[in-house]
Amino acid sequence: MKLVDEAEILVTAGNGGNGCVGFRREKFIPLGGPDGGDGGAGGSVWIVADENVNTLVDFRHERTFKAQRGENGMGRQAYGKGGEDRIIVVPVGTVVINVQTDEVIGDLTRHGDRLLVAKGGKGGLGNMHFKSSVNRAPRQATTGEEGEERLLKLELKLLADVGLLGFPNAGKSTLIRAVSSATPKVADYPFTTLYPNLGVVSVEAYRSFVIADVPGLIEGAADGAGLGTQFLRHLQRTRLLLHLVDISPALGVYGEGGVDGVSPADQVRTIERELERHDPELLKKPRWLVLNKADLMFEDEARAAAESIVAELGWTAPWYLVSALGRDGTFPIMKDVMAFFDRQREDELDARNAG
C-alpha cells in the first residue's frame, strides 16, 4: 500500500441542544411552575491511535468529520440526550497540528492514545432554572453553545529505531532488503525509493529493532530539489542514523540539478549541509558511516578507498565497509546496532536509578 503521510481535515463538534420553556400542566394545579429541561451536550471529536492502521490514505476521500448535535430539552424537566462523539482513527506516530495557529495539539505515539480535538457545546438551560420570587413563570431559556471547529493537519512520523540516510542509489533499499524482511523496490537508477519503507531486523530470538529507509537526498533538497526533504520527518524519532555512501568510482548523474561524479566525502558533506538547513536536530543524533558497494572494487582497493574517505572527513564515529548486494559486512553492523541500543537502555536505567 502506498504510504500517505500527510492530510488536512476539518473537525466540527456538535452544538449543544436548546433549553426548553415548559410549564406543569396537571389536574388541580392550574398555575404549575416551570419544568423545561436542559438541552443535551454536543458530541466531541476525538482522534485515536491504532497500531493496525498504517497510512493516512483514507483522509484523501473523507476530510470533514462532524460529531452529533445534542437534543433539545423537553417538558417535565426532561433533559435532552447528548450527541454521540465522533472517533477518528489514525496510525500510531501521528502528530496533530492546528493549521490556524501552527500549534502541535498532540503526538500519538502509543496504541490507544486518545486526543480531544474539538469539544462539544454545552446544552442550553431550561426555564426551570430561571424561577425566582419575583418571576414565578419565566419564559426564558438559553440556546446551546456551538461546538468547536478546527482545521487540522495530520503528519505521520514513522516509529523506527534506525534511519538510513544517503544519496539516491547509495544502496539504502538494498541494505534494508538484506537485513530485514522488507521488500522495497531496488533498481539501478536514482530515486527508486519514492516513499519510506520499514523493516524489522532480528538479531537474535526476541531481540529486534525497526529500520526506516527514506528517499535519498541531493544538493538543494532543502529547496525542493529531487524529492525534497519532506520525508525527513520519519527520521526524527530514530535513535541512530546509518549514513550510506557509494564508494564505487562509477557515480551516475543524480537527477536534474543533481550531482555528477561527486566524491564520496563530498556526498557526506552535502547531506550534512542539507540536514543543517532542514532539521539541525537530526545532525545531533548518533550517526555511523556505512561505505557501500565494496563489491564493485577489489578488496584491497575498497579498504584503501574507505580509509581515505574516513581520513578526509576526519570521521570519529563508527564506520563500516560493506556490500549490501552481497550482504558482506551487513550482519556485524546490525549486531553493533543492537549492542548500541542495549548500552543506551543500561545508561537510561542507571540515570533513573541515580535520580
UniProtKB/Swiss-Prot annotation:
Its EC number is 3.6.5.-. It is found in: Cytoplasm. It comes from the Bacteria. GO terms for cellular component: cytoplasm. Residues 1-159 form the Obg domain. Mg(2+) binds at residues 173, 193. It holds the Pfam family MMR_HSR1. One of its GO terms (biological process) is ribosome biogenesis. Its main location: cytoplasm. Its cofactor is Mg(2+). InterPro entries: G_OBG, GTP-bd, GTP-bd_Obg/CgtA, GTP1-OBG_CS, GTP1_OBG_dom, GTP1_OBG_dom_sf, OBG_GTPase, P-loop_NTPase. GO terms for molecular function: GTP binding; GTPase activity; magnesium ion binding. Residues 160-342 form the OBG-type G domain. GTP binds at residues 166-173, 191-195, 213-216, 292-295, 323-325. Keywords: Cytoplasm, GTP-binding, Hydrolase, Magnesium, Metal-binding, Nucleotide-binding. NCBIfam families: Obg_CgtA, PRK12297.1, PRK12299.1. Belongs to the TRAFAC class OBG-HflX-like GTPase superfamily. OBG GTPase family. An essential GTPase which binds GTP, GDP and possibly (p)ppGpp with moderate affinity, with high nucleotide exchange rates and a fairly low GTP hydrolysis rate. Plays a role in control of the cell cycle, stress response, ribosome biogenesis and in those bacteria that undergo differentiation, in morphogenesis control. Monomer. This is GTPase Obg.
